[in-house]
Amino acid sequence: MAAPSRLLIRGGRVVNDDFSEVADVLVEDGVVRALGHDLLPPGGAPAGLRVLDAAGKLVLPGGIDTHTHMQFPFMGSRSIDDFHQGTKAALSGGTTMIIDFAIPQKGGSLIEAFETWRSWADPKVCCDYSLHVAVTWWSDQVKEEMKILVQDKGVNSFKMFMAYKDLYMVTDLELYEAFSRCKEIGAIAQVHAENGDLIAEGAKKMLALGITGPEGHELCRPEAVEAEATLRAITIASAVNCPLYIVHVMSKSAAKVIADARRDGKVVYGEPIAASLGTDGTHYWNKEWHHAAHHVMGPPLRPDPSTPDFLMNLLANDDLTTTGTDNCTFNTCQKALGKDDFTKIPNGVNGVEDRMSVIWEKGVHSGKMDENRFVAVTSTNAAKIFNLYPRKGRIAVGSDADIVIWDPKGTRTISAKTHHQAVNFNIFEGMVCHGVPLVTISRGKVVYEAGVFSVTAGDGKFIPRKPFAEYIYKRIKQRDRTCTPTPVERAPYKGEVATLKSRVTKEDATAGTRKQAHP
């Protein structure tokens, strides 16, 4: 990215997660240099200073999408939005950073997967990014590579799949080992929470019944499958006192499990996504196959139409914590790989461009949350959990100048005809959203303004993340100090101890005689 010019964002309402104030924001060398009133020098702007008028608008920290899959090779295809097109679309929606996933095959090297994803992303990204790394199998090699990734590669989060049997799924014992390792090295464990065994059996049942269309995808992965795995993951994480992050929370029942666990004091965070907050699974029964197929994702959207409203309420009240998109897009011809078998439809939907507007519409415009909570769930909480704060997720002196000038009264209609993503379908088609990004600034450079991009591939950069994020590990460390079980001190037992005798039955004795007679 070229050296950014000096910027003065003047007269807007600066919104952080904990307060709002009308103020000017001075940006220099890619970071916020000053925040206050009347920062414009007398006599007007000096040479080299560009003034952006934000009067009547909101000035927000750039969004952080915690969950994307750009150009992901999956289910026989590759997601159509690559790191260039996907991050460019993100900027147009007010998101200035994504966290993608490096996912090795079973038996593959985590470090090699990480380097592969870096080689794909670094030349293409238009905004800053980081990487989670998936643990798809377990061995001493995996254990050692996790440590190397944390110490040398800037990774502090690892994802485990409880679904996708025979592809990415790990066992409960492997979860226990991976969670234990995450805690040792100061990372946060993430899980895709679905019962993979039940899904596999459910899919066989649906196909045997002649159900081959997209509706079969949801029917074989009901809410209970997600809720059971969510509770199981929380139970295992609690057993080793490891912080846990549940990705793409899609159902009311799974969300309730997380909410209950948080109220019980568990260190667990839930991530609903734009799709689960903005639409529902009734689309799987649409008469147009391509329409239904474009909504197929895992876990699936839920057919209960009250689900988005329920999840938004929990998000507004801190039972759920962050928002991602699970942006993993496939065009219609790619989805058609499963035209005769729903298990072969590549899983994934859009969202990276529309997340901020959808959450504003469904959350703030509806009255469920205020502007500060919006900033928390779209940016700040993610920055805190993944140890990017206050460099990211806040407008403050010294923070990266990732900033969005937001028009809360403006509206836009979402459509595949006008969006900037490569995919030819949009699950939010026709939704009218209040809340529109007017200007997006990435590390001090105006990269999107009034529908025009000023960015090229490679302008973004990889952001390393350190382990032991205080936001999540302060409680973990204190619990280790004060809550570790200790033995009861008691006098040794000095009484009689019974002698165990071998119980040999008549049948056992006869069998033994036969074995001796017939060696």
From Swiss-Prot:
Q: Which residues carry this modification: N6-carboxylysine?
A: 159
Q: Which GO terms describe its molecular function?
A: dihydropyrimidinase activity; identical protein binding; phosphoprotein binding; zinc ion binding
Quote the Pfam families the UniProt record gives: Amidohydro_1
Q: In which tissues is it expressed?
A: Liver and kidney.
Could you give one GO CC term from the UniProt record?
Answer: extracellular exosome
Q: Where does Zn(2+) 1 bind?
A: 67, 69, 159, 326
Q: Which InterPro entries match?
A: Amidohydro-rel, Hydantoinase/dihydroPyrase, Metal-dep_hydrolase_composite, Metal_Hydrolase, Metallo-dep_Hydrolases_sf
Q: Which residues carry this modification: Phosphothreonine?
A: 510
Q: Where does Zn(2+) 2 bind?
A: 159, 192, 248
- A single GO BP annotation from the record? dCMP catabolic process
The Swiss-Prot or TrEMBL record describes its family as follows: Belongs to the metallo-dependent hydrolases superfamily. Hydantoinase/dihydropyrimidinase family.
Supply the name of the protein: Dihydropyrimidinase
Q: Which organism is it from?
A: Homo sapiens
Originating gene: DPYS
